[in-house]
Structure formats: C-alpha cells, structure tokens
Amino acid sequence: MEHFDILIIGGGAAGIAAAKACAGAKVLLAERKGKLGGVLLQCTHRGFGINQSGIQYAAQLTKEFPGSITLALNTTVLSVSKEKTALLSGQALGRREVSFSQLILATGCREIPMGALPIAGIRPRGIYTAGQMQEQMNLYGRIPEGPAVILGAGDLGLIMAGQLARAGLEVTVVEKQQRCGAIPRNRRCLEEFPIRLICGDTLSCVHGEGTLQGCTTKKGTYLPCKTLLIAAGLRPERELAAHLGQPDWLHICGNCNTVHSMVEAVVNEGEQAGYAALENLGGTL
C-alpha cells in the first residue's frame, strides 16, 4: 500500500489552495472530475477575484500548480478509515487503497434537490437544480425550453434567472422570504430583464406527466412552465468523514466546512488547511 504524507480530497478552489500550501510533502490530490477547478469551471459570470469569471479564476489558481503533487483526476474516494487509509477508484488508478498521515477534506457543497422539499406531484422532465442547468448551459451550450420558474432568489437562483432571461426565456422567480437574499450584483438582473419575482411564497405542487407543464405555489398561484430550477440552498458535502470524529489529522476546509459566498474565503481556508497539515507532519518529512 502506497503511503502519502497528505491526502487531499477535492480539486476545487479549496483543494487547489491546500495543495499549493503543502507542496514539499508527499501529497495525493484526488478529484472526481477530469479537471481541477470544481464548480468554478461552470461559472461564466464575473465576480471572482478582480472581476473575473469563475473559469478565469480557476485558470489563475491552477497556474504553477506544483509538479511534485500526485494528481488523481477522474477518481472517486469511496471510503476513509480511522486507521488513516482510503479506498480510491478511478480511470488511471483502478481500485486502490492508500494510507496517509494527514487528510484534507475539500469536497465542497451540494445543492438541495427537489426530493428534499415538500413539493407534491410526480417528477416529469424539465426539473433541475440550478447548478445542473448552469453546467448544461455553460459547458454544453444547452438552452432549456421556456417559460421557466426558479425556486429560490439567492445568488445562484438570480444568476440563473439572468442567464435564462438573456437566452430569451420568460422567467419567474419564487422566493419564500419577503425579499431576495442575493448580493446587489446578482440582483441587477431584476432591473435589466422583465423577470417576475414572487416573494413570501413557495411551490407546493408540480404538474405534468412525462413533461413538466407548470407548478402551483402555496398561495395558489399557477405558473405555467417547461423548465423548473431548484435553487433552494447548498449543504456542505462531508459525509465521507462523518464517522471520523475530530482527529487532529483531519482538516475540513472550504464549502464542505461551511458554505461561503466569496471564493477568496474558500481559498484562504484551503491554504490554512494545507499549512496546518504540513505543520502537523512535524519532523516526519
């Protein structure tokens, strides 16, 4: 079994920053996708760093990435044990077990799906999380069918509202709070496009067999739509380490620690995790 000083799980902003901070140790970075960058790679909108898109910011982060780090792309970490071993599965590695001295968890967060919400009805075609549609549009050039309804007026919900409106779709945003919670930059789409915003309400039911036809709000408003995006929030994705407790060799950083609104905070946490892991190694290098 090959041993690594530090195992980093996740190749988004936090994982990249952690890897760069602990270069010099024997490091393995496992990323389930085929490229470093995480969710940044599907963000064409600006607002990262100095008015950069997420794609540009990811390119900047990965510039001068340490060649000494073992990079395992298209690799999933299936399990981690309290004995400091991890089971990996990937295209290049196959199914392989490794051991480590320090673990950095940088697995990010995941969207709350429709199945976790109290919305009645079957699940016809046309329902996506906002992030899924962002990926489809920005990476694969797919334009969904309108009209569109978006549940949630946070940052991601309004980013997608603006993007759909720009693509020519009629868009309605439903927000359960009395006002939208997005930052001012992302709220601008409500002024630039004829986007309907319904606050103080939520969805109670979806309609359609085979294909989505519409949805009804809790207050009884029927909204015809062919596309429904769920932007109901994000949850840290740290189930992989839930059974480990809080050992001093585990460092949780970025959005799997707590969901951040600014990528700079994610990068900072990743760097700090890398430095802490390196310090814990002490004289073992």
Task: Describe the function of each predicted region.
Residues M1-L285:
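Residues forming the flavin
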